From Swiss-Prot:
Annotated catalysed reactions: (6R)-5,10-methylene-5,6,7,8-tetrahydrofolate + glycine + H2O = (6S)-5,6,7,8-tetrahydrofolate + L-serine
Positions with a binding annotation for (6S)-5,6,7,8-tetrahydrofolate: 121, 125-127, 355-357
Coiled coil: none
Cofactor(s) required, per the database record: pyridoxal 5'-phosphate
Name of this protein: Serine hydroxymethyltransferase
Lineage: Bacteria, Bacillati, Bacillota, Bacilli, Lactobacillales
GO molecular function, one term: pyridoxal phosphate binding
N6-(pyridoxal phosphate)lysine carried by residues: 230
Pathway annotation from the record: One-carbon metabolism; tetrahydrofolate interconversion; Amino-acid biosynthesis; glycine biosynthesis; glycine from L-serine: step 1/1
Keywords: Amino-acid biosynthesis, Cytoplasm, One-carbon metabolism, Pyridoxal phosphate, Transferase
Primary localisation category: cytoplasm
Source species: Streptococcus agalactiae serotype III (strain NEM316)
NCBIfam families: PRK00011.1
Amino acid sequence: MIFDKDNFKEFDQELWQAIHDEEIRQQNNIELIASENVVSKAVMAAQGSVLTNKYAEGYPSHRYYGGTDCVDVVESLAIERAKTLFNAEFANVQPHSGSQANAAAYMALIEPGDTVLGMDLAAGGHLTHGASVSFSGKTYHFVSYSVDPKTEMLDYDNILKIAQETQPKLIVAGASAYSRIIDFEKFRQIADAVDAYLMVDMAHIAGLVASGHHPSPIPYAHVTTTTTHKTLRGPRGGLILTNDEAIAKKINSAVFPGLQGGPLEHVIAAKAVALKEALDPSFKIYGEDIIKNAQAMAKVFKEDDDFHLISDGTDNHLFLVDVTKVIENGKKAQNVLEEVNITLNKNSIPFERLSPFKTSGIRIGTPAITSRGMGVEESRRIAELMIKALKNHENQDILTEVRQEIKSLTDAFPLYEN
């Protein structure tokens, strides 16, 4: 039978092999991509359930299809858990991704052509915060704020100045490569000063907000968006939160029928599982460990004069390092580290001088290694091995030594037990 899972290997050997190879790759690699994590078997089980068969346009109790009693329960569980976890009045769990969550928020709050103030991509923002190649930059008139050239941290006085000069209808706070605490209260004060909406994209830090290790944007933002993966450790998807009932209605209309048709109820079920996991007291320990591991790794780079640690440290799950004193660019650093089974991504740094295809920096994140059970000791050692590989990137003997030690680490901390 085609639908017999046990027959999958025989039915589609080529696809089975690709998936199997990816599982082996994940097991044998140290994953330091800040936006990646390791979900539980329960999350995967929910996402692989019969819910993938069901179409359910609309919202719980207001569907355009019959036979939705069960998926109504599933989606309602996800909604209530999201509201509880983040202490929000309203939640929409249907966005297929963080980008679509952002698109829905824009659609609900502003009109095409309106001015929006968002974080510059090179300073740590996201494509959907106004990059010219993104729908956001094509649909709305984005102006950007950056970081202070000396501290490489947000300069709220300068952001206020830009807001007063440009009079945006919406201000977007949040980042994809910023390692410091974001003061959402100050952002709301800036938004109020120019009569703008405040939207917070907390995709990268949602898990840390949930665990209590980063201030929550919910009391200050008119709308908060996030992904459900990254530090939240759920399936790949989006989520929108607000405390404003009128805005919530606009958000719901923007998601469906504005941007999407049928929701992915199997993914929503997996979101519900991840949200329940995040409500468990153990998740607070997980959030704390993510930050401890990131700070331990960052300290190793900070103590080496051949590397520049952006903003001189980290308060969250990630940090950026300028590698150009030891290797030509971030792209080459990424490739060298991949040779020794350490996966991360090249990344632009503030006031970047190289192209985004090369970059001066790399971005390093600890959610995935923390999920595997690695701690401060392992994090320090991984950073030391990274430095060893980068400084000796033309020495195959040393790269082999590093690769072997990485294998010992990954063997000691399996991706999944049994």
